[in-house]
Structure formats: structure tokens, C-alpha cells
Amino acid sequence: AMPYAQIHYPFENKEIFDDRKVYPADFIAEGVDQTRGWFFTLHAIATMVFDSVSYKAVVSNGLVLDKNGNKMSKRLGNAVDPFATIEQYGSDPLRWYMITNASPWDNIKFDIDGIEEVRRKFFGTLYNTYSFFALYANVDGFDYSEPDVDWKERPEIDRWILSLLNSLVKDVDGFLDTYEPTRA
């Protein structure tokens, strides 16, 4: 069990564990079905053996259901092969689809057609934006190694865009720090 087995404690790496470099864990993540089993067992072991908690925070993932809201099952024939899905659509569109369609703690209705839509609408737009930039950057001989222009010397539109970017970074960091990746 994490974090004991992952570092082969107590047979090896005792100093890493005893120095609290890997223990307690900052957070753990697992399905909601593990609440009474794994989550409880980790704390019970930690309390009995080390008089401590084994993790500081927990993210309990919801279930991945089929597009009709039924539990996925090989027996029912509605399970999706994750490796084939990644091979066909790529891992980034799959990740983006999963993180933007439901909060991690909510159940998600998985529809493979949604990954294609994400790939086309989000990643296609991102790719086209980059292609547009790259085309004109190459034509104009753009070189990012040019020195940065001081904030006060930039045009107002540049300062406005940079202000929006800095606000976005602050918001995203805040959402990630509070375990709200869907809002990030």
C-alpha cells in the first residue's frame, strides 16, 4: 500500500520514509468504491504503526459509465479499450475529454464520439492557431531570442493581453491548488 510498498519500506529506503520525504503523501486518488477499503486501511495502518495519517488529502474519482449511464463491463460488451482509444485518438484528446466533461469526483458518461469532437474542435483550433503563427513568424523572420520589451514600453494592447494572461494563470493555479481541475 502507498507509500510503504512503493519504496519497499521497511526493507529498503528507511531513511527516506523516516525523514518524512515521502510520508505522509500530499494526496491520493482512487475510485469512490475504495473509500471503506483502501482509504481506511492506509489510515488504520499509519495510525497503528506510526501514530500518523498516511495522506493529507484524498481525491475520490467517480465511475466511468458508458454513454447511456450504465456501468462499463466486459460482460455487457460496453467497455472501451483504453489502449486502442489512445492509439486512435491520442492521449491528449482523451485527457482533455475526461477532465472537461465532469469533475473528477463525479461519474462521467463516456462517449467515444466526444473524443473525436474534442480533437476536432479544441485541438484542431489549437493546431490551426499555431500554424497561423508559425507561417507568419517564419515569413517575418520572428526570433524569440530578441530581448524582452519592458512592460511600460509595450503598447496598451500588449499590456492588456499580458494582464489577462497573468489573471488566467492566477485563477488556474488557485483552482488546481484547491483540487478543482475542471474549473481550471
Question: Residue ranges of each PLM-predicted region?
Answer:
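Structured secondary-structure scaffolds
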Residues: 1-139, 144-147, 154, 158-184
